[in-house]
């Protein structure tokens, strides 16, 4: 059985730590110390590091881990150019990574947040990096709104039972934005209550699920009439279709603060 643990890093990052017996895999280790500390609790061998994209808060701990850990060197997987490690195993759309005999991840290209962004999809689980968050999605740093829209839509077509492990704890801020767009959405209110309780107890709000995101995430709900109307009011013009709505929402969210009204 694969155990998945969230290792907090920086202010709001999560490094996802996958363990099977003494072996472990980490995804997006922006810092080395949380990984080393967790390895000391009985997981003696880090066998692989997976990277979703090149931002430093996802890759910053790789070099230190490679230099400081005893035993065989972990394999490092990621998009081309994500890290200077000469042993980087470059992966892209459609590739598979078999981490254990019974556990394989498929690589999905999901550009938008960055052009090189990858997600890792396994049996009923997804590691989307900074492409999809709970009740939100990543900012545009390199790609276009159209690319990010297509990537989010693609992930949204995964089975509803898919557990989603984003790389940041942004849930409450995202739900504040979502609730302003859909004040009558009881599922958003229910989830906000659960998420608030989790954070008060210093617990992650994650993983989420694809079905939950279809219920609460405005970036997966651009075809909903209420979302469309809210985006049109904000833009002050008629919006032609889901991509136009998504584009307005993404730009709007960039400047949103939790106490700012959206209606």
PLM ranges: what are they?
Residues 153-163, 172-263:
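Accessory terminal helices/loops
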């Amino acid at each position: 059985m694969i155990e998945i643990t969230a290792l907090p890093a920086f202010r709001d990052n999560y490094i996802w730590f996958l363990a099977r017996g003494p072996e472990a895999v980490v995804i997006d280790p922006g810092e080395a110390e949380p990984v080393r500390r967790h390895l000391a609790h009985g997981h003696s061998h880090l066998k692989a590091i997976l990277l979703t994209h090149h931002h430093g808060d996802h890759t910053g701990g790789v070099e230190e881990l490679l230099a400081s850990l005893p035993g065989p060197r972990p394999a490092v997987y990621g998009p081309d150019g994500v890290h200077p490690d000469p042993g980087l195993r470059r992966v892209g759309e459609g590739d598979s990574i078999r981490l254990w005999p019974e556990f394989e991840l498929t690589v999905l290209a999901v550009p938008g947040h960055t052009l090189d962004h990858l997600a890792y999809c396994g049996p009923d689980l997804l590691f989307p990096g900074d492409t999809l968050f709970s009740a939100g999605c990543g900012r545009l740093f390199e790609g276009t709104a159209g690319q990010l829209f297509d990537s989010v839509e693609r992930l949204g077509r995964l089975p509803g039972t898919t557990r989603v492990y984003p790389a940041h704890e942004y849930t409450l801020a995202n739900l504040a934005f979502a609730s302003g767009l859909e004040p009558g959405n009881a599922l958003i209110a229910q989830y906000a209550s659960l998420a608030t309780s989790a954070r008060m107890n210093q617990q992650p709000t994650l993983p989420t699920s694809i079905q939950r995101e279809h219920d609460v995430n405005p970036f997966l709900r651009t075809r909903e009439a209420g979302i469309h109307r809210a985006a049109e009011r904000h833009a002050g013009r008629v919006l032609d279709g889901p991509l136009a709505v998504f584009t307005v929402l993404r730009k709007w969210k960039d400047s949103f603060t939790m106490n700012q009204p959206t209606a």
